[in-house]
Amino acid sequence: MKAQEIISSIEAEEIEKLKQNSKKKIPLLYVGDTVKVGVKIIEGGKERVQPYEGTIIAMRNGGINETITVRRVFQGVGVERVFLLHSPRIANIKLIRRGKVRRAKLYYLRGRVGKATRVKQRFDRSL
C-alpha cells in the first residue's frame, strides 16, 4: 500500500466520523452560491458566532481539506475569506441563494464593482 493510499483512506475515515458525530450539516454547495458562514470567535473568555455572508468564488475539493473562498464587499472594499469546511471553527453554513454561473472560479469578480458583481439566481437547483 502506497503512502498516498494510506492518507486517503485515513481522510475518508475521518470524514465519515465527522458526518456521524457533527451536529452541523454542510449543504451541497456550488460556485456562485450565496452563503452565510457562522464562524466561532473567542473574545476574552466568551465564545460567539460571527456570521460572514458572501458569494462563493472558488472551491477546492481535497477530502478533509475541502475549502471554499467567500467574497463580499464591505464598505466599498472587497473582502475574501477562505474557510475549511470541516474545521471546528465553522459553526454552521446556511445557503441563502443559488447562483447561475458558467465558470469554476469566479476570480473575474475581483475586478468589478457595484452592480457588476451580482450573480444571476438559479432556480433549477433546490436550496
UniProtKB/Swiss-Prot annotation:
Q: Which Pfam families match?
A: Ribosomal_L19
Q: Which UniProt keywords apply?
A: Ribonucleoprotein, Ribosomal protein
The answer to whether the entry has keyword Ribosomal protein is: yes
Gene Ontology CC annotations of this record: cytosolic large ribosomal subunit
What's an example Gene Ontology biological process for this entry? translation
Q: Which GO terms describe its molecular function?
A: structural constituent of ribosome
Function (record text): This protein is located at the 30S-50S ribosomal subunit interface and may play a role in the structure and function of the aminoacyl-tRNA binding site.
Query: Of which family is this protein a member?
Result: Belongs to the bacterial ribosomal protein bL19 family.
> Mind telling me what this protein is named?
Large ribosomal subunit protein bL19
Q: Which organism is it from?
A: Trichodesmium erythraeum (strain IMS101)
